[in-house]
Amino acid sequence: MASSTDVRPKITLACEVCKHRNYITKKNRRNDPDRLELKKFCRNCGSHQAHRETR
């Protein structure tokens, strides 16, 4: 089972516009301590939008 101090935890990315949680990925907590933000395709909006890490 993954611990809460895992170096590469699973994170969920949610669309900034429609707030749908579209992607699940992993990130390295040591290299990226802040919230991750990527431009990804949102199927709900039908265009590329900023997706931000949710907690």
UniProtKB/Swiss-Prot annotation:
GO terms for cellular component: cytoplasm; ribonucleoprotein complex; ribosome. It comes from the Bacteria. Keywords: Ribonucleoprotein, Ribosomal protein. GO terms for molecular function: structural constituent of ribosome. One of its GO terms (biological process) is translation. Disulfide bonds: none annotated. Transmembrane segments: none annotated. HAMAP family: Ribosomal_bL33. Belongs to the bacterial ribosomal protein bL33 family. This is Large ribosomal subunit protein bL33B. It comes from Mycobacterium marinum (strain ATCC BAA-535 / M). The lineage of its organism: Bacteria, Bacillati, Actinomycetota, Actinomycetes, Mycobacteriales. The gene is rpmG2.
